[in-house]
């Protein structure tokens, strides 16, 4: 199984948000390719939904804002009803995970990396630690600081394979 955690930069291109959709065609082509790969699992974190919704709320043109909000509403409904190409990851953070995020807030803020991105990074870490049999995992993002989150996971060897 190969896991891609969807970042806000990707969802903004999927929804085609003005001024945040420079890679719309490329993202849509990759999304189609990922959907066709039966070994691929797409994960949509709550932070990605919230950040994307905030970007939609700040679209200057009211008609465009409404149009993109309608697309977002449909996307959320399809996600909840298991009709989207990804799986919703809405697990709330445990106390320890929030403490880990709190330790990184200042250093990341200095580098202009917000809590939304830290939350997505935490989803990456948690998913990697709790879901067995992952071949690879990455944060699917257009942001270079998040693209660095990619790992090939070592195969778990069964006793009879030794």
Protein language model features and the residues they cover:
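Acidic, glycine-rich loop-and-strand cores that form catalytic or ligand-binding grooves
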Residues: 70-79
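A generic structural signal for short hydrophobic patches within well-formed alpha-helices
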Residues: 11, 49, 146-147
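Short His-Asn-centered micro-motif
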Residues: 6, 44-47, 140-143
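Active-site neighborhoods of divalent-metal-dependent phosphate/nucleic-acid chemistry enzymes
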Residues: 81-145
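C-terminal/domain-terminus segments
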Residues: 134-135, 139-141, 146-162
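A generic secondary-structure signal
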Residues: 30-34, 74, 123-130
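Short, well-structured N-terminal submotif of metal-dependent ribonuclease cores
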Residues: 1-44, 55-71, 152-161
């Amino acid at each position: 199984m190969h896991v891609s955690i969807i970042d806000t930069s990707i969802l903004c291109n999927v929804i085609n948000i003005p001024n945040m959709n420079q890679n719309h065609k490329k993202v849509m082509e990759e999304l189609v390719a990922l959907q066709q790969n039966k070994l691929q699992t797409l994960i949509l974190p709550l932070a990605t939904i919230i950040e994307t919704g905030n970007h939609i709320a700040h679209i200057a043109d009211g008609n465009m804002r409404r149009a993109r909000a309608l697309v977002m509403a449909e996307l959320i409904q399809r996600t909840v009803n298991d009709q989207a190409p990804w799986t919703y990851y809405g697990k709330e953070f445990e106390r320890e995970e929030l403490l880990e995020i709190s330790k990184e807030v200042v250093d990341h803020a200095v580098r202009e990396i917000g809590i939304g991105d830290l939350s997505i990074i935490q989803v990456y870490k948690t998913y990697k630690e709790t879901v067995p049999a992952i071949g690879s995992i990455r944060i699917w993002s257009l942001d270079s600081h998040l693209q660095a989150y990619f790992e090939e996971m070592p195969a778990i060897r069964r006793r009879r394979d030794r």
